[in-house]
Amino acid sequence: MATFKDACFHYRRVTKLNRELLRIGANSVWTPVSSNKIKIKGWCIECCQLTGLTFCHGCSLAHVCQWCIQNKRCFLDNEPHLLKLRTFESPITKEKLQCIINLYELLFPINHGVINKFKKTIKQRKCRNEFDKSWYNQLLLPITLNAAVFKFHSRDVYVFGFYEGSSPCIDLPYRLVNCIDLYDKLLLDQVNFERMSSLPDNLQSIYANKYFKLSRLPSMKLKRIYYSDFSKQNLINKYKTKSRIVLRNLTEFTWDSQTDLHHDLINDKDKILAALSTSSLKQFETHDLNLGRIKADIFELGHHCKPNYISSNHWQPASKISKCKWCNVKYAFRDMDWKMESMYNELLSFIQSCYKSNVNVGHCSSIEKAYPLVKDILWHSITEYIDQTVEKLFNTMNPVQVNEQQVIKFCWQIDIALYMHIKMILETEALPFTFTLNQFNSIIKGIVNQWCDVAELDHLPLCTEQTDALVKLEEEGKLSEEYELLISDSEDDD
């Protein structure tokens, strides 16, 4: 097990390039980071060992072990470290697979010179010169085309490595696939037969067994990454708006593509070494506004919602009620985004005004058939079921027929800010005393979509973007939400 980790440890003494590239946290003497809270077991994509995983500082996904986490490396960095060199984005072509094979042959060669070098370093006891598997595990690294695949919404990212062992992948953000069919089985067999030809007979059999066992593995079904896969440990609440702290390794050197980077690895090693020596760790504070988080917040909002508010005589906003056992949800908004709180207040205040205008109800302790529909309005607010849910709620308010249209009365007091917002939604100078179903539907949707256009939101957080993209967004001032920027501007004005 951990053949890749052992190979990185021993081969780092072979060349100067190896000494810079093969430094991984799993081979260091650092104390491992405590991972008692993390119950995810899988393959660390940096050292390829099967162990307990923790969340990466760069992408907030669980893919790094408690030793490698101290290097703070991510496969989305632009520094050409080993993890980055093993990473390719879809589509995977034969040219990209050839780059992986060339990388292995460059960093982990097997020839008589390398074998003799290892014989000289392993000489404490006589048995260590007998080519036992225990002492020469680093020579048993076959070249395979297995990869851990992260399936983001619009792209797939492949991290190639030698992943040994088996483990259930229930909680892992990635799945293991075998890309040998995209290359050539016989050609890859020939590459490995040539590598193992220099090995002693007893190691050849072990090498061949490892190679054929892993190179013929079937691919797993890819798993799409959702917002729940990301860590919440690096989220901060700033102005009641959630931001995410992301750490990335930057270098001054740039490459147009990953294949160009591999071309320089073969033909211009000095450029790679210069890039590694000038790299730095940079912190980004990115907004966490995305469709995945909006769905999670709305689900939580619907779970904590107290629909009894629509029957009450409370004049305070729904989120501020604290002394009514039927309407109290104040504790639920301690960590909630302010936009969710604003939406909740306006939505329940508007529904309260409509409900009290049309239904004879006097207290929030009443049991009404509209209560489940209020929760459904929240849960379905950004789904395709919102129209039929709004219609059901509309029908509970005893609509009457006027000029061949169903209408409800609107004659209950509302907040001035909500009054102005409804005027803006309906594009009218004065609010009518009756609402049709279309008007009622438009107001509900307008309140929900006030702070963000769901159609334009990214599906996943910005921490899934490449480092170059984060740098560009930072230069354009798009890493923070507009609300945070407005606050910053007002503070500067003072």
Curated annotation (Swiss-Prot):
This protein's GO CC annotations: host cell cytoplasm; host cytoskeleton
Chain spans, region Important for cytoskeleton localization: 84-178
Region ranges (RNA-binding): 1-83
Region annotation Interaction with host IRF3: where it falls in the sequence: 320-494
GO terms of molecular function: metal ion binding; RNA binding
Stretches for region Zinc-binding domain: 44-81
Keyword line: Host cytoplasm, Host cytoskeleton, Host-virus interaction, Inhibition of host innate immune response by virus, Inhibition of host IRF3 by virus, Inhibition of host IRF7 by virus, Inhibition of host RLR pathway by virus, Interferon antiviral system evasion, Metal-binding, RNA-binding, Viral immunoevasion
Motif interval(s): pLxIS motif: 485-488
Secretion signal, residue range per the UniProt entry: none
Transmembrane segments: none
GO biological process: symbiont-mediated suppression of host cytoplasmic pattern recognition receptor signaling pathway via inhibition of IRF3 activity; symbiont-mediated suppression of host cytoplasmic pattern recognition receptor signaling pathway via inhibition of IRF7 activity
Assembly and binders: Interacts (via C-terminus) with host IRF3; this interaction leads to IRF3 degradation. Interacts with host IRF7; this interaction leads to IRF7 degradation. Interacts with host CUL1 and CUL3.
Name of the protein described by the UniProt record: Non-structural protein 1
Organism: Rotavirus A (strain RVA/Monkey/United States/RRV/1975/G3P5B[3])
